[in-house]
Amino acid sequence: MAKTLLFGEEARRSMQAGVDKLANTVKVTLGPKGRNVILDKKFGSPLITNDGVTIAREIELEDAYENMGAQLVKEVATKTNDVAGDGTTTATLLAQAIIREGLKNVTAGANPILIRNGIKTAVEKAVEEIQKISKPVNGKEDIARVAAISAADEKIGKLIADAMEKVGNEGVITVEESKSMGTELDVVEGMQFDRGYVSAYMVTDTEKMEAVLDNPLVLITDKKISNIQDLLPLLEQIVQAGKKLLIIADDIEGEAMTTLVVNKLRGTFTCVGVKAPGFGDRRKEMLQDIATLTGGVVISDEVGGDLKEATLDMLGEAESVKVTKESTTIVNGRGNSEEIKNRINQIKLQLEATTSEFDKEKLQERLAKLAGGVAVVKVGAATETELKESKLRIEDALAATKAAVEEGIVPGGGTAYVNVINEVAKLTSDIQDEQVGINIIVRSLEEPMRQIAHNAGLEGSVIIEKVKNSDAGVGFDALRGEYKDMIKAGIVDPTKVTRSALQNAASVASTFLTTEAAVADIPEKEMPQGAGMGMDGMY
């Protein structure tokens, strides 16, 4: 296919137009007085949201060069969402600011490679300073504050803090839609491990790409299943019992996989296969954990187990199982509670005896999976539109909370970025264009606070100057229009979110500046209807 080419300034300007279109759409949502964006959907009602990455994912521009710019910044939002789960709007805004400031200098003749070096140095310094002012999360109150700021709702903050308290920091928290009007918390015993389905054809919900099994039987084995004959006697019993099946095995392949998928597609019976979690000895222990939780038996060569001789009473049971591409959650395993308690105590004894940090971490994980359970936040609302919006906000708040527990918290409202400006500004370079890169970051660090003020209808520059001249940690509460100690006021951001947003924005933006040529497909001209095949005018 023929291509169209743009070079130098023209290429960068076209791409910058796309960056600005995406970033200007996203940044209106920043801060306590940020607005929402409404997204048209091909099916169902439009989606109203203030989640940066959700908005960015929907944006495709008609002009190929503008679209390239937009897609690059979309990557900033997506990467930040993957790493920290929140802060996507801030990341997009920072990327736009770095690109804008950088292009001014590149146009004036600065070397983009040297600018990139300066940006990298400044970002490393800024991250180091952000980590210095970070404070660990202490107790339920701090967790509630982080969640409340992320979701812009104190009730949600309290709900998530309750969930974290009930299942512990290692526990699993999921967000589901509720049939009632209110949002509530439900804690269910359960276990999650990071192995997904072996074939996408096994899903029961093609929109969410997940398989949900109600009251399934659970076959647990450390063998590889490739021959369907090994499973046939057991499958016949399961079909007669009218049950669904979850298979946890070393692997499922070949003829066995094909037969299971074909039967699922024909509707004969529903079966989902997942690979066993962990490796080596840890895999054996984790399979035993699952067996204890579900009341099943691990069918293993070590104890002379044979799949052909397996019976229904060797299978575990659970109230429900949810399998996604990456994880499996077993809820309310029907195992003997006494045996589960014994298993938990056994792991606790191992924890006390081990000296290896790695082993401790893995044992702690197993303990959480056996004892912690799964907390389910059920989101309710009057309409589907409101429900989707609330669900996205709660998911963001949950991610922010987990990030805060991992790396601590910093003053919110863009204050952390402004607080580190002085230290970053002290950096110097003998090479002029590297110094330009450092100065770009110094200016860009002001941008989140400026935008929060702008969204509250205020002049950002005045507020930034006042914060710069205040004590460290003092910022601007845009909701109440007051200057205060942000951490004491409960206006906090997770360190991980603040750090990731800056690192990802700088990574993509500095690479963007080094672009000297852009190549895109020439759009195909649409043929008028009825043309072609020499049939015009025929009736």
Swiss-Prot record:
EC number(s) from the headed UniProt entry: 5.6.1.7
Gene3D superfamilies with a match to the protein in the record: GroEL (3.50.7.10), GroEL-like equatorial domain (1.10.560.10), TCP-1-like chaperonin intermediate domain (3.30.260.10)
Nucleotide-binding in keyword set: yes
Residues holding ATP: T29, L30, G31, P32, D86, G87, T88, T89, T90, G413, D477, A478, L479, D493
GO CC entries: cytoplasm
InterPro entries: Chaperonin_Cpn60_CS (IPR018370), Cpn60/GroEL (IPR001844), Cpn60/GroEL/TCP-1 (IPR002423), GroEL-like_apical_dom_sf (IPR027409), GROEL-like_equatorial_sf (IPR027413), TCP-1-like_intermed_sf (IPR027410)
Major subcellular site: cytoplasm
Catalytic activity, as annotated: ATP + H2O + a folded polypeptide = ADP + phosphate + an unfolded polypeptide
Pfam families: Cpn60_TCP1 (PF00118)
One Gene Ontology biological process: protein refolding
Localization of this protein: Cytoplasm
Molecular function via GO: ATP binding; ATP-dependent protein folding chaperone; isomerase activity; unfolded protein binding
PROSITE patterns (UniProt xref): CHAPERONINS_CPN60
Keywords: ATP-binding, Chaperone, Cytoplasm, Isomerase, Nucleotide-binding
Assembly and binders: Forms a cylinder of 14 subunits composed of two heptameric rings stacked back-to-back. Interacts with the co-chaperonin GroES.
Family: Belongs to the chaperonin (HSP60) family.
HAMAP family: CH60 (MF_00600)
Known function: Together with its co-chaperonin GroES, plays an essential role in assisting protein folding. The GroEL-GroES system forms a nano-cage that allows encapsulation of the non-native substrate proteins and provides a physical environment optimized to promote and accelerate protein folding.
Official protein name in the record: Chaperonin GroEL
Gene name of the record: groEL
